[in-house]
Amino acid sequence: MKDADDSEEVKEEQAKGTKKGRKSSEPAATENDDDKPTKNKFAGILSKFERSKKARELEKTRESTKDEDSTEPTTAEPVIAQGLEPLPQPEAAPEQDEMPTYSSLPPWLANPLRASAQERRKFADLGIDSSLLRVLEDNGYREAFAVQSTVIPLLLQGPTNHPGDLCISAATGSGKTLSYVLPLVTALKPLPAPRLRGLIVVPTRELVKQAREACELCAAGSGLRVASAVGNVAIKDEQRESLPGYVHRSEPNVDILICTPGRLVDHLRYTKGFTLKNLEWLVIDEADRLLNESFQEWVDVVMTSLDARKAPDAFGFSGNFLSGLGLPIQSKEPRKVVLSATMTRDVTKLNSLRLANPKLVVIGSDAAATEDESGGVAPSDEQFTLPPTLEEHTVSVGDGSQKPLYLLRLLLSHIKLETKILVFTKSSESASRLARLLALLEPSLSDRIGTIIKSNKSSASRKTLTAYRRGKISVIIATDRASRGLDLRSLTHVVNYDVPASITTYVHRVGRTARAGQKGSAWTLVAHREGKWFASQIAKGSDGKITRSTKVGKVQFKLDNMKEVKARYASALDLLEKEVKTGGTKASKPSAQ
């Protein structure tokens, strides 16, 4: 019973506590309801404060990050592999054509002695011996050309003598041969026993013949002996002529020798007693070709032979005596005269000749030829001068397929066959084919055409030249073999059927005419593909290389009125093809239609 009463008391107390709790919770709820308006009133201010606080903290964080970045090394971002792309380039600056105001050439090459091509003087005013003057007058020489008027006083003894070697640049046909032959003959006094004292080296047999004729003319009556040496004569025959005692007693028999470089080397190597120990004059004509081509290394052989003159044995007892005393042997170097229409200014090539106190003489070029208007020095190391009486023309031949017809039209309508004509081709085969083709196209020309080609024997070339001089033929078709040393008097026209391969070749080709002050014309057949090169390099004279008196003219004509000739041209080509296949047998000449 007691336990039951206790449990009831506990329940009552719990119930009372529950009631008290409810009563106490009601006033609390009332207080919270009173605080709500106050909190809402300051919520905006608090939110602004919180945002401002966060912004300040964020700014501090950023500043601390910057400080860390400045103290710590930066880490490169990883490079992503991509394809190659061109880098952007700035625009190229415009190029300016600047000419150097200085020359790398030695002074004697950079500042030559220049003379006008129009200069003329009487031979009597040049200091030539009276005996030589009579010889010249008897042969019709009374007035000296520009190169002779300038060079002869420099080589002869006198107030204007140049004590050294000479290099001479003058146009072909300007009289260079006589300009060195006259002083050479004057300087070499006759001796009781002939000695080789004058040596003239030229590249071709035609030039050997021309120089020998000039030497024999000037040496007439002087007692000087003149000989020549070329490759078409057996060396034993020349040995008997120049050294009659070749086997038992070797002694020279000539005072002046004109030779080609190859034959000179043969004599120096294989002819006993043939030496240059007494040489006083060494003349090198057409020097550009002789120095550009080796010709059995002739320069080295000649210089070695000249060095042998300084050996004690060359002076006999006196030489050995001086050598024993330790005294040097003095040997005077021969005077060297170097000539060319296209004189090289290559210092290396000229140095191989061991020139002493050299002077360059340029004929036919104005003083300002190597300078432009701004005062710069022209970059060209070569200067070419054409004869002042030469007229130049170009003939357009289209694509070149009918070039023989253009040549025929030029010969018949513009040049006339009564004049003398020299036609240049690029090869011997081309020259032979062209001569045959012209004969087939115009049968009347067959007896008036001759050829000078490399395959010709010397006798055949001589026959052609003899027929030309006698007037039997008026047209010669030749290769560049005839561009040097061939002196065809009264030649009025040169035709370049094939465009020359270089400026030098062109200068030597057209130099066959307008010689010795006579008038002459040069014609060049130019196809479309060749026009640009010819115009820039030759007609306009690239870099001022060519000095000419008149501009190159242009000639154009059509083949409209040549229907019959065109028909013969087609049949002639067929016939020419058959002749080539059958071994070149000449068919009968076709009759004119």
Curated annotation (Swiss-Prot):
Give me any GO biological process, just one: rRNA processing
For this protein, what is any one GO molecular function term?
ATP hydrolysis activity
Asked if the keyword ATP-binding belongs to this entry, the reply reads yes
Which sites bind ATP? 170-177
Task: Give positions of region: Disordered.
Answer: 1-103
The UniProt annotation puts motif Q motif at 121-149
User: Which Enzyme Commission number(s) are listed?
Assistant: 3.6.4.13
Q: Which CDD domains match?
A: DEADc_DDX51 (cd17956), SF2_C_DEAD (cd18787)
- Biased composition (Low complexity) is annotated at 84-93
Keyword terms, alphabetized: ATP-binding, Helicase, Hydrolase, Nucleotide-binding, Nucleus, Ribosome biogenesis, RNA-binding, rRNA processing
Kindly state the positions of the motif DEAD box in this protein.
285-288
Give the domain section of the comments.
The Q motif is unique to and characteristic of the DEAD box family of RNA helicases and controls ATP binding and hydrolysis.
Q: How does it assemble?
A: Associated with pre-ribosomal particles.
> What is the official name of this protein in its record?
ATP-dependent RNA helicase dbp6
